[in-house]
Amino acid sequence: MTNSADTSNAVSPFQQTGAQEQPIHRIRIIGVPLDMGASRRGVDMGPSAVRVAGLEARLEALGHEVTDGGNIRVEIAETQASGNEKAHYLEQIAETCKRTAEAVVKTMEEGMMPLVLGGDHSLAAGSASGAAEFYRRRGEKIGVIWFDAHADFNTPESSLSGNVHGMPLAALLGLGPDGLAKIFGYAPKIAAANTALIGVRDIDAGERENIRRAGLTAVYTMRDIDERGMRAVMEEALSVAGRGTAGYHVSLDMDWIDPEDAPGVGTPVRGGATYREAHLAMEILADHGQMRSFEIVEVNPVIDEHNRTADLAVELACSAFGKKIL
């Protein structure tokens, strides 16, 4: 098809990568150096480690327009009282999540996709809330794809540790303290019917009850991946998250991956996704083209090996944003 208009200076929304065209994204990196949700220190350096691993340059090499929005202001644990023993630093974490949510909304209002770097997983109560709020203002809703070794479905009442990084998914589905669950004044942010949890292999007894109470059924354990394969699990999960929604928020906890490939995480669990399974999951996300916001959390360079986990995080981000083998 020809067009008489002069398009010599136009920017195409697609780039050619191999046999398929991939959309070009305007991406804003948002760092959240939060570690108060975890008991093991060091994950606050995760955003820097992922940046040092070349995230911005690698995404730009794929043709994306990338800007770095810097870091969200986060309180330092050593200067704060931990407060409630059933939810350590809850007040400070809730404030950080609110700031993160507002930054995500602003990013999306400016036509960019948020790429949030953690930090511990408690920040996701903010990032996913921001994405949900952006679409709520448009009369739409989103789903969520949650890659994690853990369910993150505790509340202060069910938690055995009081670590808030074990609570964000429950908060997004309306369970738990208002400071996490009711950012922007309402809950839930995500419907259970549009939520998919992938790769879980360590669930507390209280979380099982919370999952039943919330009506969450799309929980894919590592056994499901072993028996059915990553593609079948991903296709079903994306159908769940995409049903009647404008797309989905993707939350990637690096402990979802087996610690042989991702050693630099605070709560490693043996038997996770392999290197190639993780890449395949990200590649399928890119193929579907419905990802609306993305985050990588729980990279802990203090316990990493030569920045291997941060390097892998960058590789997986590239796959999620369209990098192909051929």
Where are these regions (language model features)?
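Catalytic cores of soluble, metal-dependent hydrolases
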Residues: 2-34, 40-115, 123-127, 134-137, ...
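A general structural motif
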Residues: 176, 196-204, 232-234, 274-279
